Amino acid sequence: MANHPLSSSRSNRPFFVRSLAGHTSNLIIPDEFFTAHLEGKTGLTKLKLTSDASDRIWDVRLNGRRFAGGWDDFSAAHCLRDDDVLVFRLDVKMVFHVTPSGRSFSQIRTSSSSGDYDSDDDDDEAGDDDSDSKNISLKKKSRFEAESSSSEKYCLLGLTASNLRLNRVSFTKHFSRANGLTKRCCMIDLMNLSGESWTLGLRHNKRTGQAFIRGRWRSFCHANELKPGSFYRFKLVRNGTRPLLQLCFKVIPQGNCSNSKANGKANVSEKYSREDGSASTKQNKFLTVTLKHYMIQSGQLRLRRSFVRENGIKEAEEIILVDKNGVEWPSYVSSSKQRREFYMAHGWIRFCEANKLKTGETFTLEFVRGEGTTPMLKFCSEAKIEQEEAPEERGTPLPKRARVSAEVGHSRRTQAPNKSSDDPKILQRKQPLQPCSFSDQAKKVKQSIVNILTGIKRFRSELELKERNLEAALLEIDALGDKVSEINKILK
């Protein structure tokens, strides 16, 4: 396995390069990089990996300098091959961003105006022509720079009691320089996952040299229920005279945000939410089903492997089907260990019958997995799917009709019992469903009320905007009338 430790990149962030060619075990962090940037850190037992291909943050355990548990899952999810070359860039404390630099390529030539580091481009095979090797290196370098520039649109903002009290938060110097936000004084918009925007001021701290935003940071955090001690990922969707930052997904540390800085580490645990992701990640949130006769006969709905892999389904588990009216139908995902396939074993036939879905009809389900809750497959409209797949959408608007409350869903479920199967193998796979506790129902009711209030706030802001536009139009009409009167007087 090739070893290419590098001290710094064009962005002045430490990184190292590893080739997967001919490897027989998990990757090892180069000794030079480990000594310079990681040695001596307390509690160095695991790290975090991110990539442009997924919004997920992957936990990888460390056995000394060698990657251990979690690396195989990361490799499988990103379809890594033995001729890939990976760039590991240290973004924040123990969080590495992984970028592929191409196939069958042994080294990357890095150059900077300051001349921090410069390495030669050599091919693995000694018999190759020098000019061909340089051409390949330049192509791989351009691809690496393009992929790195796309990742520079993202930033992690830590929420602390201090920046809530001051009503401001600072960007990293690298993010500010990469996106031209240094020494600027303008308005900037923060957008949440529902498409609502808050206007803040972008300012520059002359003492620290950092760019920061202030004004409505506390209001944005409270409205979106962001918790102190957490890191949240934002994407720079629009730059220019008025930049726009959109909340992508959140990452919650194991310890407090302010304490992590003192301890010299940021232990981050993974959490999912709806985000901008790659096109493949967005598509794999949706499961499109064309109802066939053999599906009804077998009572099984097979799930494609990419859908299972991208949504973290690793074993048999309960799942809830939610129809277009918000009614929930308990189901169960079973697995075939021999074929390594997953399928829904029961419940979904009753779901189709109740929603009057006929053989030959096509419908789409959206996968939603909350923290510590049973995953759901929600009936999705075509308009919502098109909006999710649009690359420049400002965000997913909230539904106009509020979700049915938990009590209604629970009562409807009692009227729609699951159809039992005569197959003894399926009966063995079934597991008893646990009844919903009062606290779970209270959480659902609370979430329903929050969704209604959020929708009301959004509609209220839209009405206020339309009202201001109408008032401006009336003023223009009055001004035009005055001008017409003056012209008539002159003509008379």
Swiss-Prot record:
The keyword Transcription applies. Pfam families: B3 (PF02362). Residues 117-131 have a biased composition (Acidic residues). Residues 105-134, 385-427 are annotated as: Disordered. Residues 105-116 have a biased composition (Low complexity). The keyword Zinc does not apply. Residues 385-395 have a biased composition (Basic and acidic residues). It is found in: Nucleus. Residues 12-104, 154-250, 286-382 bind DNA. One of its GO terms (biological process) is megagametogenesis. It comes from the Eukaryota. InterPro entries: B3_DNA-bd, DNA-bd_pseudobarrel_sf, REM_fam. GO terms for cellular component: nucleus. Keywords: DNA-binding, Nucleus, Repeat, Transcription, Transcription regulation. GO terms for molecular function: DNA binding. This is B3 domain-containing protein REM3. The lineage of its organism: Eukaryota, Viridiplantae, Streptophyta, Embryophyta, Tracheophyta. The gene is REM3.
